[in-house]
């Protein structure tokens, strides 16, 4: 069994926590999780890939043991990927990402031309800037963001969290290994013995705001502008995947990605939901290795 090595890069106020499976010297694979999760939820996928690749996965900013600076635009996350790539001097990278983490990799690949060998992106968060809309978020999405702020953040113990999440529809199909990894690494101990979400409701709400804006085609970015137009200039092979049981918005954003990215290929995971890597890790490993041939 290949146990991951945990380390971090950067100063304490801007650190990025990283897991590594397997010894150095093999072609690198870089994994980026979706919103709310942590690097460790890739464990079942990463262990299998480590026989072929040196596998790295990061806690994205606002999550796990990484920094929580308050800035959560898409380009902030892409810049973090670039920091990891440059610090570790990674080349010919196989980027593997889920949801907003997949977006990080797509945008970073444009910022670092020639560094990524290929990208395998599962239901990335994408807007099509050619069809952007004016105006802000819908009342429905604003209500979802507000609802995130009311999410329970503190629990008596990891076992309490596991049992509560195991019964929740969002985690019902996760493997036990993936869910336990999330509970172990997605929460931090408090002085009174209880535990608290690392990605607190306040942080998650801030992260979700630009994501919902991208979903609704109203994202405009910050002073750096809207980065999504750059996807038309990617210079490496990209496979965009969807999951048959996922929600309509994820399939719509995948269609946007396909329309923007040159030479893209597609894949469908049957009988799986949005978190396919945590539901059916063996199917993800098979598909990732097939695209890597």
PLM segments and residue spans:
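Conserved HGGG/HGGXW glycine-rich cap/lid loop of the alpha/beta-hydrolase fold
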Residues: 17-67
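Conserved serine/cysteine hydrolase catalytic core
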Residues: 177, 187-259, 265-268
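The conserved beta1-alpha1 loop
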Residues: 32-34, 98, 242
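Helix-rich cap/lid subdomain of alpha/beta-hydrolase
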Residues: 129-199, 218-219
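Conserved acidic catalytic loop of the alpha/beta-hydrolase fold
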Residues: 76-93
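Alpha/beta-hydrolase fold catalytic core
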Residues: 1-31, 51-53, 90-91, 126, ...
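Conserved hydrolase catalytic core segment
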Residues: 48, 91-137
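Catalytic histidine-centered segment of alpha/beta-hydrolase-like enzymes
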Residues: 269-281
